[in-house]
């Protein structure tokens, strides 16, 4: 039934003819004046009329589709030719305000498929820019968009500058996941690239010859994030930071709220109780002051203290892949 369309009443004289659209006989048919028909309307007794089998051709040909749309609009402005089965899906997309090369799509476990010839990423290609995300959905996939000339720009970049960029923590070792949440990172500390990435940079020919390339997206998950400045002894916390799944660091330059010291990356941890490892617990004593239902509303925050609203509805976090 995808090849047919039902309209609330007939298109042609007698509400029963099956004259194909576009034939010369169509112009000769005239519908009777509605004022002359004093009886009950025919379309109330008949559920609808099936457009002939040549109707799908009007969906392919733009001229014929416009002709069919004009015919339907003359009968009822609210009618539109629905000749194809709707197979669409609503997705939320947010583009980076600075560089629109990273797009965040709320597709859940599914990701946005790319039909372009540059699905994979070259080992020498620079890392994508930061994106903007909000805690609206649980898991999201990332897909990158390229511009014309990006390949030339990536070739023009020198090697040391590329190595100085923060590496994406997609393939972290198990040591990072088991680190103590109380251990904090120095402001100038950077992570070294993993051996797999180093090997792929040293042997670009083997990586290009592999039929299966590494996907250019990574899943994100919300975790509890906190900041600690050792210079001014200031600690402030925030929650539901979107980081790469399986890691505990977010690559976004953060400034201290007191001394404006910058450090990157900052550490995050799971949004759960450190005593019983549950999202909702009833432990009499907690290691930190945090409401697990509203982890951003706490004394150490300062952004939403003594406020009537929850910060979980008004803020978003950035990350660098």
Swiss-Prot record:
Its main location: cytoplasm. It holds the Pfam family Zn_ribbon_3CxxC. GO terms for biological process: negative regulation of translation; oocyte maturation; translation. One of its GO terms (cellular component) is intracellular membraneless organelle. Residues 145-154 have a biased composition (Basic and acidic residues). Residues 110-214 are annotated as: Disordered. InterPro entries: Zar1 (IPR026775), ZAR1/RTP1-5-like_Znf-3CxxC (IPR027377). GO terms for molecular function: mRNA 3'-UTR binding; zinc ion binding. It comes from the Eukaryota. It is found in: Cytoplasm, Cytoplasmic ribonucleoprotein granule. Keywords: Cytoplasm, Developmental protein, Differentiation, Metal-binding, Oogenesis, RNA-binding, Zinc, Zinc-finger. A zinc finger (3CxxC-type) spans 222-307. Transmembrane segments: none annotated. The keyword ATP-binding does not apply. Belongs to the ZAR1 family. mRNA-binding protein required for maternal mRNA storage, translation and degradation during oocyte maturation. Probably promotes formation of some phase-separated membraneless compartment that stores maternal mRNAs in oocytes: acts by undergoing liquid-liquid phase separation upon binding to maternal mRNAs. Binds to the 3'-UTR of maternal mRNAs, inhibiting their translation. Interacts with YBX2. Disordered region at the N-terminus undergoes liquid-liquid phase separation (LLPS) for the formation of membraneless compartments that store maternal mRNAs in oocytes. This is Protein ZAR1-like. The lineage of its organism: Eukaryota, Metazoa, Chordata, Craniata, Vertebrata.
